[in-house]
Design a protein with these regions (language model features):
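Bacterial Sec-dependent N-terminal signal peptides
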Residues: 1-21
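Beta-propeller blade termini and top-face loops
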Residues: 20-239
Length: 239
């Protein structure tokens, strides 16, 4: 018992002495900074978009942590999408009106651990507020491309459901800022749109890749007769 009391007394004296010791920043100079939070990870980075005229403004989409915004070129970030589906597949910014941001929910990395989304969302105030603007049954969105001459015209690539056939796969277009959508390229229920690019000199020229795939609990089938590359020279009217 005496030894126990002596140990406690020595510990208290040591703590008191440590509390009075002055610690300078050089004491910890050799320790490298490391991430200690938040506890809930954001997951994979699935999309990054920046504002051309204001390079310090960035939006980052994640597989499980929503959308984050930086106004310091990536030194600091704040979450701006906490009330909405946290799985994000694509982001696009209207460079003529950079406060207008489009987000497609549901990441397109077709792993067996992905989460689904709930369609397209849009903000007109730099991420402060969001409205859902359609494609609710898409589940996974891989790309958003905006017409640089008309911010109301957008193309959205939808791979579609991971585990089953779906008629909601394909390439969609809106000409009214997301109020209405038209499916402009569709192969079959097994094949979705994986990617789309636009000729920066002529926004009517598009290339779209269609991808046939299917995930099962223990396997993944990638490719098939539905997979192909398509080109349009009239804004998606013909392919």
């Amino acid at each position: 018992m005496k030894h126990f009391l002596l140990s406690v007394l020595l510990s208290c004296l040591s703590l008191a002495a440590f509390a009075q010791t002055k610690v300078s920043s050089s004491t910890y100079g050799a320790i490298e900074a490391r991430s200690i939070g938040p506890a809930v990870m954001g997951g994979r980075i699935t999309a990054i978009e920046g504002v051309n005229k204001t390079p310090k403004v960035l939006y980052v989409g994640t597989a499980g942590g929503g959308v984050w915004k930086s106004t310091t070129a990536g030194f600091t970030f704040e979450p701006v999408f906490e009330k909405y589906p946290q799985s994000v597949g694509a982001i696009a910014i209207d460079q003529n009106k950079p406060e207008t941001v489009w987000v497609g929910t549901g990441e397109s990395n077709m792993r067996n651990s992905v989460s689904v989304g709930m369609g397209m969302y849009k903000s007109t105030d730099g991420g402060k507020n969001w409205n859902r603007i359609g494609l609710e049954n898409s589940e996974h969105i891989s790309k958003i491309v905006l017409n640089p001459n008309d911010g109301n015209v957008a193309y959205v690539a939808v791979p579609g459901k991971l585990w089953s056939d779906s008629p909601d796969r394909g390439l969609y277009k809106t000409s009214d800022g997301g109020k209405t959508w038209e499916k402009i390229l569709y192969t079959d229920e097994k094949t979705g749109c994986a990617d789309i690019i636009m000729d920066p000199r002529n926004p009517d020229v598009l290339l779209a890749s269609m991808w046939q795939f299917r995930r099962t609990p223990y396997s993944f089938t990638s490719g098939g007769p539905g997979s192909a590359l398509y080109k349009s020279t009239d804004g998606g009217k013909n392919w």
